[in-house]
């Protein structure tokens, strides 16, 4: 847990989508940038430009995907695509909090015409497809740590 000396919250202009920046300065004067959702795919560039313009250290310490609607995670797909391609204006993301719907949250017996855990897992993860990319696959290919923080709500 970060002990904050100062912080501010920004709600970014991404149309009907969602994207929030939580910027924290801890008691040792270290800066922490948390991005909560990232709007649609096209909003990824807008968010990168905003962070580069207004923040000294263009690194996202924590990226949080609140749920798997593309107007919440699509911008992350764009940002990771740029990072994967080695684009000069790409921004490093150090960690993700994102649920993986393929991580045994679905009972195979509840899915018609499927009787294999790997098939169910792969189909469930397709919910994060955007353009010809998949958010979870991009995160993993870039070796960015990802943690499930909202998993309890799935089973309740």
Residue spans for each PLM region:
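Flexible, acidic/histidine-containing loops and adjacent segments that form or flank the divalent-metal
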Residues: 1-8, 77-156
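Active-site metal-binding loops of divalent metal-dependent hydrolases
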Residues: 36-41, 68, 100-101
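Conserved beta-strand hairpin/beta-sheet module of binuclear metal-dependent hydrolase folds
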Residues: 2-59
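Residues that form or flank phosphate/diphosphate-binding pockets in enzymes
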Residues: 42-46, 71-74, 106
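Residue-level recognition of the N-termini of beta-strands and the immediately preceding loop/turn
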Residues: 32-33, 59-62, 91-95
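A short acidic, amphipathic alpha-helical/loop segment
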Residues: 47-50, 75-79
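Metallo-beta-lactamase
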Residues: 60-71
